């Protein structure tokens, strides 16, 4: 019985994945998207860490608020102003290659004293791949194991598919932002139409009542009736 238990423990230990104690690199930076409410007369900044020699694509869109516009700036980790836009509804900017450090993205609504803005933005990093690991994997495969299939062609096809899938996800996210902006516009227009329609109905009813009262006064005989 003890031998069976020891064998089971040994089997479980062999199945456990190896744990790296030291020398672990930083976790990969993930793409992200964020929607926030920018109050009137306020400026809000965000910081995003980026590795060196990568590609950072920034997309933003104002999906709610009067005017659908906002000021946008993008600064490098060294404080260099890379992008500066004023009163824009949307924008797409790419930084390539990136510097190691924190990039600063600022959205400014200080020009508006009344209307708050609903802003959507997305950060897309070019997924980095360790070239040494890829080369080591390719060298580990013997020529007779490739079955006459070129590894470079396979890697190129996979990379093309990955790029197209990432672009599809990006376009779907943008379409979702466009849909949210259009829905906000339609809801705002519906509220205005309902309000002014109610005002028109109230005015029509008031005019009708006044006309009836006026006509009744015209036909009233105020002369005394002889008895």
Curated annotation (Swiss-Prot):
SMART domains reported in the protein's UniProt record: EMP24_GP25L
Parts of the chain on the Extracellular side: 24-194
Endoplasmic reticulum listed as a keyword: yes
Tissues where the protein occurs: Widely expressed.
Coiled coil: 145-170
Keyword Cell membrane on entry: yes
UniProt domain GOLD: residue ranges: 43-125
Motif (COPI vesicle coat-binding): 218-227
Bilayer topology term: Single-pass type I membrane protein
Cytoplasmic side: 216-227
Entry GO CC: COPII-coated ER to Golgi transport vesicle; endoplasmic reticulum; endoplasmic reticulum membrane; endoplasmic reticulum-Golgi intermediate compartment; endoplasmic reticulum-Golgi intermediate compartment membrane; Golgi apparatus; plasma membrane
Family the UniProt entry places it in: Belongs to the EMP24/GP25L family.
Oligomeric form and interacting partners: Homodimer in endoplasmic reticulum, endoplasmic reticulum-Golgi intermediate compartment and cis-Golgi network. Interacts with IL1RL1. Interacts with RNF26; this interaction is important to modulate innate immune signaling through the cGAS-STING pathway.
Job of this protein: Potential role in vesicular protein trafficking, mainly in the early secretory pathway. May act as a cargo receptor at the lumenal side for incorporation of secretory cargo molecules into transport vesicles and may be involved in vesicle coat formation at the cytoplasmic side. Plays a positive role in IL-33-mediated IL-8 and IL-6 production by interacting with interleukin-33 receptor IL1RL1. Also plays a role in the modulation of innate immune signaling through the cGAS-STING pathway by interacting with RNF26.
Identification of the protein by name: Transmembrane emp24 domain-containing protein 1
């Amino acid at each position: 019985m003890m031998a069976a238990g020891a064998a089971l423990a040994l089997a479980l230990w062999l199945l456990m994945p190896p744990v790296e104690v030291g020398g672990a690199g930083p976790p990969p930076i993930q793409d992200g998207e964020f929607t926030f409410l920018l109050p009137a007369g306020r400026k809000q900044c965000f910081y995003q860490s980026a590795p060196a020699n990568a590609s950072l694509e920034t997309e933003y869109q104002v999906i709610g608020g009067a005017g659908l516009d906002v000021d946008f700036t993008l600064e490098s980790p060294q404080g260099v102003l890379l992008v500066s836009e004023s009163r824009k509804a949307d924008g797409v900017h790419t930084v390539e290659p990136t510097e190691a450090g924190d990039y600063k993205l600022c959205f400014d609504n200080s020009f508006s004293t009344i209307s708050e803005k609903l802003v959507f933005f997305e950060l897309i990093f070019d997924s980095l791949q360790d070239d040494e690991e890829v080369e080591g994997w390719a060298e580990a495969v013997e020529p007779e194991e490739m079955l006459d299939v070129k590894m470079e062609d396979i890697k190129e096809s996979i990379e093309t598919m990955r790029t197209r899938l990432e672009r599809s996800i990006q376009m779907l996210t943008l379409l979702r932002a466009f849909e949210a902006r259009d829905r906000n516009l339609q809801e705002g227009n519906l509220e205005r139409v309902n309000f002014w329609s109610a005002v028109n109905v109230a005015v029509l009813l008031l005019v009708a009542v006044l006309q009836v009262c006026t006509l009744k006064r015209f036909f009233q005989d105020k002369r005394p009736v002889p008895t």
